[in-house]
């Protein structure tokens, strides 16, 4: 029991590491909350601090989710699903104790959780994400639509035995929870997409014809 409690606390604390914020403060003497979107996640880190910092932020945030999901194996914990540990890491990332409970949008960490529990489902979602990203040129749109598709896929794939051979109710509930967190954390982005003013990446088709310059 004590091992389980320690593991759950560690999962939350692991998720609470504010990677982008600390990289900005330590290596660039910048507080990401004062630049760009004010978010401390991967996208704003790329935009404000550059490719190296953005890549490091993504990698660490991603691995937080995977490592937390694998904690039960490392600590020999039984009786609690690895997905619980992964969810706690995502909650920690979103509401980090080390950063005033103001965290990121949970995309990278959620992806890490999925990899840690279902690698095949992760690969499928990466293909979906990359396809939407190319078509729309927006990380936010790719994140939100991938979250919606993840829910639908978790519900429908077991019916045909594709990727998910049988229903796992708890896995489905966790996927729904992670997806809802991602969607809710992107509510401002969704509004900008509706207004055609969302920020773009420098490649892709931009099929929705966003014009972020119009908001300046």
UniProtKB/Swiss-Prot annotation:
Q: Which reaction does it catalyse?
A: an acyl phosphate + sn-glycerol 3-phosphate = a 1-acyl-sn-glycero-3-phosphate + phosphate
Gene Ontology BP terms = phospholipid biosynthetic process
Its EC top class is: transferase
Q: Known EC number(s)?
A: 2.3.1.275
State any GO CC term.
Answer: plasma membrane
Cite the GO molecular-function annotations of the record.
acyl-phosphate glycerol-3-phosphate acyltransferase activity
The record, for InterPro entries, names: G3P_acylTferase_PlsY
Record keywords: Cell membrane, Lipid biosynthesis, Lipid metabolism, Membrane, Phospholipid biosynthesis, Phospholipid metabolism, Transferase, Transmembrane, Transmembrane helix
Which topology term describes how it sits in the membrane? Multi-pass membrane protein
Give TM regions.
4-24, 71-91, 113-133, 144-164, 165-185
Annotated pathway:
Lipid metabolism; phospholipid metabolism
The record's listing under SMART domains reads: G3P_acyltransf
Cell compartment(s), UniProt: Cell membrane
The free-text function statement in the UniProt record for this protein reads: Catalyzes the transfer of an acyl group from acyl-phosphate (acyl-PO(4)) to glycerol-3-phosphate (G3P) to form lysophosphatidic acid (LPA). This enzyme utilizes acyl-phosphate as fatty acyl donor, but not acyl-CoA or acyl-ACP.
Family membership? Belongs to the PlsY family.
Assembly and partners are described as:
Probably interacts with PlsX.
Recorded hits in NCBIfam families, A to Z, give:
glycerol-3-phosphate 1-O-acyltransferase PlsY
Its protein name is Glycerol-3-phosphate acyltransferase
Species: Streptococcus sanguinis (strain SK36)
Q: What is the lineage of its organism?
A: Bacteria, Bacillati, Bacillota, Bacilli, Lactobacillales
């Amino acid at each position: 029991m004590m091992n389980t409690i320690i593991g759950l606390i560690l999962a939350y604390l692991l998720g609470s590491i504010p990677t982008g914020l600390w990289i900005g403060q330590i290596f660039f003497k910048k507080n990401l909350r004062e630049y760009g979107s004010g978010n401390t996640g991967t996208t704003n880190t790329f935009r404000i601090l550059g490719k190296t910092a953005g890549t490091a932020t993504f990698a660490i945030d991603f691995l937080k989710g995977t490592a937390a999901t694998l904690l039960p194996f490392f600590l020999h914990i039984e009786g609690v699903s690895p997905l619980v540990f992964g969810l706690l890491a995502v909650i920690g990332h979103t509401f980090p104790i080390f950063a005033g409970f103001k965290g990121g949008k949970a995309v990278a960490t959620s992806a890490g959780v999925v990899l840690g529990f279902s690698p095949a489902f992760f690969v499928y979602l990466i293909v979906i994400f990359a396809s939407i990203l190319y078509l729309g040129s927006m990380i936010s749109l790719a994140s939100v639509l991938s979250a919606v598709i993840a829910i639908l896929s978790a519900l429908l794939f077991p019916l045909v035995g594709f990727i998910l051979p049988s229903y796992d109710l708890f896995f489905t509930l966790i996927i729904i929870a992670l997806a809802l967190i991602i969607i809710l954390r992107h509510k401002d982005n969704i509004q900008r997409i509706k207004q055609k003013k969302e920020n773009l990446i420098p490649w892709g088709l931009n099929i929705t014809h966003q014009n972020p310059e119009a908001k300046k």
